[in-house]
Amino acid sequence: MSEELPSQFINYFSKFSNKEYSVVNVERIFGGASRETYKIEVKGETVERLILRVTQDSSLIETEQKTEYLAYSAFQDSKVPVPVLLDMSEDKNILGAPFMLMKELEGEAASPFTPDVYSPNEKELGKQFWSILGEIAKKEINKDIFETFVKDTPCPGWKNELDKWVEVIHDDSISTEPILEAGIRSLYRNPPKESKKHSMVHGDYRSGNFLYLD
């Protein structure tokens, strides 16, 4: 974390909210592969617990900040528990890099090394987990948000996605994977039918992406 970040952030946030705040705590959250993430607590007339996501120069997973922001935007005030968005900025002069700001969503990620970490609530948590994924998939996405995602996207949609991910796989591969290549050839020969309804899906089910409360 940059030594200047706490002072840079409080100057920005006080101007953004038009209120005076002081920093109580800034804590780096490790584990995110796409952006540096910080838990920030500030105090003014009230105490605010915030999450700051800062774009890195290089990361294990390359994603556009705007894509993440729009995905969260699509599920504000819905049955899907997403953080309340506050701001997004591409201006590097504010905090040294582009960033997103949101309210903290309470919960914690389970450690894969802790046995029976979800016990005794694993059945209920499992139901909630799959129910939330269902809510994501069936949600009608705001037209403006959807068109931003698909703008300049060639048709059919399946080919655009397959071309994109095949390129990612080939760029990241150190050798040819015969079984994987056979699967790719099969998908091109037997493409899915074009969907009449477009929706978002969540494709990363790792435990670090699932927050739970006791």
Residue ranges and their predicted role:
Residues 20-28:
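Short secondary-structure junctions
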Residues 1-21:
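Juxta-kinase regulatory segment immediately upstream of eukaryotic protein kinase catalytic domains
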Residues 27-182, 190-197:
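ATP-binding pocket architecture of kinase catalytic cores
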Residues 200-202, 207:
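Catalytic-loop of the protein kinase fold
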